């Protein structure tokens, strides 16, 4: 599966006033680039913009925190429910890291706190010893953390809040 990344902004050129006369009438304009938010529900970045626009409007006076996902490794849950590790792209040709970078950028754009579990949890299920210690099943489920893995996540969250 996969959702296209998309863009956070579109960009166009607009004439803007930079000078006025004593009556307050604009007398001189220059051309400037201007960005507009993209709220395209068919793209990941558009969805992030739509989500944060809603949350920042509705909860304008609250602390808002977003977290990145963990690193991903192989998981098999039977039938066609097979999750490949992050070294494989999704069907749109993007890797997990691109979505993580988009979440980091969205936190910057929308001025929300970020807990970067991808970077700061220390969980790396691509390696056998890490998978055996911190994930449900070294052979079939390197996607879901076990109790030790959840403790690492909790520690990373507590360091940030």
Regions found by a protein language model. Give the residues of each.
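Alpha-helical cap/lid subdomain in secreted, periplasmic
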Residues: 1-161
